[in-house]
Structure formats: C-alpha cells, structure tokens
C-alpha cells in the first residue's frame, strides 16, 4: 500500500483519487478551495456536460494538440466507460445534440456529490481550504508536499492543479511553476476556447448565425477554415465556432477573420439567386429582399457598410451594387484585434510537454513518483465536452 497525494479537486483530481483508492492505496486529496469541483460545476451552464457519446475516431478528431499521447489512457478508460461508470454509481446520463452527455438530474452538483460520496466510502482523506505551496523532491524522487498548513510525506504525488483559466475557481498555474522548478519542460501557455475581439465596431451584439464558414488568416495565409455557429458580441465574436477556432490559431496571432454567410453556394450562385429574387419582386426595397436571406440587423449592417441607401428598390439596384452584396455575403471580413484572456478562457492551451510524461502511468520521466494529470498537461480539445472527458480518465 502506497501513500498517495492528489493535489487539486477538479475532474482529473477527483478521478485520480478515486482510482488510487480502489486499489487499496492510502489517498489524501488537497484542495485550496472550500469546495470540490468548483470549475466542474460551471460546465454546461451548471448542468455539467460530463462527456460525449462520439466514437473513438470522432473523439480524436477533436483533440487539437498531441492526440497520440491519449491513445493509451483512452484504451484504459474511454468516454463510453465514463457513461457506464456514472450509471453504475446511480447517476445515469442523458444525451443531447452533438452527442453531449449530461447527468439525468441536469445538475453539476450531483456529479460532485457522487465523487465526494465515493471518496469518503473509500476512506480518502480530504484536505479542504489547504493550498499546496511546493513539492518535496529528493534524489529525483518525490517524497512529499508543503502546504500552507504543514509538511506531508508521500510515496506518490499526483498533480491535478488544472491550467490558468477561470482564475476565480482557484486555477493559478501552480503545476507549471513546480514543473519548471524541477526542469520539467512546459510549452507556451495561451487562453483557449475564448472569444475574439475585432478592430471594427458594430451594433450587432446578441445576433447569432448558424453553420457559417469561418476562415482565419494572417498575412493573407489561411490558418483555419471550418463551418460553425457564431455569436456577435459587443467586442467581436463568440459562439461554438469561434471558441473551437481559437485554440487552433491564438498562438499564431491572426490578423483577419472572414465569414461565409452562404457556404453552400458560390459567389456566382449567390449573385444569380439574388438577381432572381430581385426580378421577382422588382418594386420591393432591396433590404426587404435581403431579409429573406439573412437576419434584418445584418442586412442593415451590410447596406451601411456598402453605402447603399435603405430606400433603394430592387429595380434601381445596379449590377455593381448587387455583386458587391453577393461578395460581402460570401466574404464578410473583419480585422482581428485580440482574443479574450485567461480570465474568460474555458481552458488553457499548452502545458507540461507530453514527451516529459509516460502515457501509460502519467508519471514524470524525470522525477519518480510524480504524476501529472488533466489540464496541466499540453492537451486541449475543441469543445468543453470532449475536454472534460479526457480530464476525467487521465
């Protein structure tokens, strides 16, 4: 029997503590907050999007960085195993769009309470409101930890401190600091799954668009191209499509984002379609015809941007004006100012480099008995659901 310490009471820490206790180890979990699973309770707007029902192949498509590192952990405990784990412990899940899985109770609190019950049943000692301040290492082996309340000796220390996102939940990047001190390599860190700010100002906050083409460029080079849902904000753009994109390109500092509002048609097809509508309703105002294609608020923005008068009728519209509208519908571009910071980020992009860790055991290749799990590692995914999923089973 080993004395095992888990630092961090988030998803990966809770699962690590439970898994270690299952095989008879003496486990103690340290959490700097007064409650466990603080960040976990924010997922799915408080409903807790615990995992996803997608296939193995689909799962790995959504991993942005270092997906091969996850092959071994995934083979030991998959998303389907997670669903069965919850069900067997009295918390069945329900499936919603895009395979998102939620607890049947629709309460993130129930997920946290389940883990608390399991940990206490297995005699895991919980140190709440106690912050770990340093790791104790001797002769390249971890021997314990220092906290703001004392010193503790352990055979194994599992660091599950999370990243730097959602600072209000206690994530302050401690794991990275300790790794750097021990010469365990950490990649550059960036906020992930964040909104984008533009240089242009527009009065479209709250407007959402579904299944539009999203293209991001830097110096005219395409960095990212995908379909997704977007939301106009007071500062720029958010929504699932923007959040997913951000993790791919934030470190490349893009300068332009372009939206294709009608991705299933070419510019010529859009132009022909618009001409047909205008011929059919030649006495109608042009903006009313456009409102049959895109939201009214966006029509007003496009008309203003092209300096086209609101009162212009279809039969008064020139070929050049019509073509300009078609081109803007296919290429609505904005200059990128910046992305939101860690205070608004859902995840951290980057972390402890995976080549420093044994994927079968999550143990450091440099320090015996020291393991890193969850968001502290250089692993991130496109969506919150997939992200929570691999945080659990690492």
Where do the protein language model's features map onto the residues?
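Beta1/beta-strand and adjacent pyrophosphate-binding region of the FAD-binding site
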Residues: 1-12
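Glycine-rich FAD pyrophosphate-binding loop
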Residues: 5, 21-45
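Short hydrophobic core segments
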Residues: 5-7, 30, 132, 152-168, ...
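An anion/pyrophosphate-binding glycine-rich loop and adjacent beta-alpha core
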Residues: 34-36, 41-42, 50, 56-57, ...
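Glycine-rich active-site loop/strand segments that organize a redox cofactor
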Residues: 47-95
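A glycine-rich dinucleotide-binding beta-alpha-beta segment and adjacent secondary-structure elements
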Residues: 128-129, 300-380
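A conserved short coil-to-beta-strand element within the FAD-binding core of flavoproteins
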Residues: 128-141
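A conserved FAD-binding loop/helix module that cradles the flavin
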Residues: 165-178, 182, 379-394
